[in-house]
């Protein structure tokens, strides 16, 4: 079912929603489509449309990413392998059989001088937003499309520029570099979001971090509060004052130790809430109540197991305390390889039954990616 921006915002702010959403946030991982075709899947199933998922269409307003990027250089590109130099000047490599994101082998920033060479890519430029783009977004918003703007992650961009190890060390040994990077990006955020907020209220501010593994985040709550929270608040307080209600963070892994710090920074929606990283949406709901909302939270690994295990996962995650709003139920990541089509269909049917939704076969085909 296609939702409107108002329905989605009402759901995520606990404003008397009709029901929770049931979605597929990401879709199948590489290779699963071929597995399912061999098991009799239709092309509508491969495209996720057959399962009548809930979704809200969205539009990203304003360019808060890097600009004036140098041309990427391809060093090797075969059927199974890609090697190149990306827009940051990093040497990157990707195995096309298992991945869609090239991984960096080198990083451009070790010192302040390194940063100054690429700083212009993060600074404000009028090309980042235009009156025509704002007008287009306003027209879409009036039609029910969710309008979002996305700032760079306060940790994520540092990791992209410096690598995880050097980034974490720099918080202690070169805080001036960290501060200058975040200050530069923040100034750009404020200028662009100020222009937007004079003409319309965005529905959601988004940020991507991916800053944690199974055992915890790569920096703790003290560093988040000292460096990341002020960066967040400069953007969030601006759009919040203009009427924006949602500030959504995307981060894998175990974020439990830093949730309170990020709430301090304005975050009120977390996803994908990875159970393998000890992110339990039921426990989090009981701890935080209506203070935060979630997308995801259903263990993607369970759907490769027995049907009874699938049912128990759904009964636990979809218990009555989770039905008050503030939740988009869905797998915590892409559907993993080895998930049988039979199991996936059982998962869909069981979830829809628990939620009181009609069988997907009786509904209009629908799906929209919900990773925003």
Model region roles, listed by residue range:
Residues 1-39, 83-85, 94-95, 112-372:
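Active-site loop segments of alpha/beta catalytic cores
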